[in-house]
Curated annotation (Swiss-Prot):
Reported function: Assembles around the rod to form the L-ring and probably protects the motor/basal body from shearing forces during rotation.
Pfam family, one: FlgI
Signal peptide limits: 1-24
Localisation: Periplasm; Bacterial flagellum basal body
Keywords: Bacterial flagellum, Periplasm, Signal
Polar residues bias spans: 301-321
Chain positions covered by the region annotation Disordered: 301-322
Keyword set includes Endoplasmic reticulum: no
Protein family membership: Belongs to the FlgI family.
Entry protein name: Flagellar P-ring protein
Gene Ontology molecular function: structural molecule activity
Subunit description: The basal body constitutes a major portion of the flagellar organelle and consists of four rings (L,P,S, and M) mounted on a central rod.
Organism, as annotated: Allorhizobium ampelinum (strain ATCC BAA-846 / DSM 112012 / S4)
Amino acid sequence: MSIRVLLFSIFTGFLLAAAGPALAQGSRIKDVASLQAGRDNQLIGYGLVVGLQSTGDSLRSSPFTDQSMRAMLQNLGISTQGGQSSAKNVAAVMVTATLPPFGSPGSRIDATVSSLGDATSLRGGTLIMTSLSGADGQIYAVAQGSVVVSGFTAQGQAATVTEGVTTSGRVPNGAIIERELPSKFKDSVNLVLQLRNPDFSTSLGMARRINNYATATYGAPIAEARDSQEVVIQKPRTADLAQLMADIENLVVETDTPAKVVINERTGTIVIGADVRVSKVAVSYGTLTVQVNETPQVIQPQPFSSGTTATQPQTDISAQKTGDKVAIVDGPDLRTLVAGLNNIGVKPDGIIAILQGIKSAGALQAELVLQ
């Protein structure tokens, strides 16, 4: 079975993820769950980006950049005694990366750099050798390479134009893994699959699907749903662990998720899940628009009166009330809900207020998530 996803755009910034009749969706286990023993790990480090075109840190405003540059040069055997440099071609940055599960020494991962000081752009810079450490303080990777920045800045004597973010960027494949995390995958007796979206129905369905496969292959069930998020798998004695996981992660299970409505009040974005239901409710919507226009009038003095030209303010205020429509919204499915809101011509901010009111009235059969 598959869900048909429909996108409804009522006004700019209003998005609805919808569906026809709510049906269970078939997904591979690898797409809905991850192996507990194979999780990612975060790495962090401090470094310098050099080669900037006068867009780096001001060494007076960012003393840590000057200290780091001097320490680096001293480590290279270069004397730093003398006056302070006024060049702005160096920037202090924080470097982050994600160490994937089972990452082996010598393989490469992406690194992200973010400015710490008052640099205006990292475009054209090069990250010099930076050690990346884990939460245990051990060094797991070393990053170095050219920084790729998506935004740009154009500056003149009287104006500056900036598009996107220029104070952060990426070093594609710029970090080399030097140490792998200790892994007990090969020695594991029990494996734990963790659902990315915890749900009892999905967890039990996954355990049943794995047991059907195991019974046909090994002659006995091997999986048990521990709770809404975890499914425990016991390794058969004759099974190769890598082959077992390769077979299990490609099994297709029917997934289920609770009904949710997610609202981002800053952007006016609304996402409504497929299983959202609305009980019969009446909605009234109206808006008051007030427009204020300032049109100053120029008053000229009389001839030979030695007067001066003056301006007299003139304000025109108009008010218009729109809406005041009442619609009966009864949502056996999402299409009916969208049609009901369209009938009264609501805008994104009005839709947010209406959904909050419907939830308060107890007519929205879903979880309302505000971001």
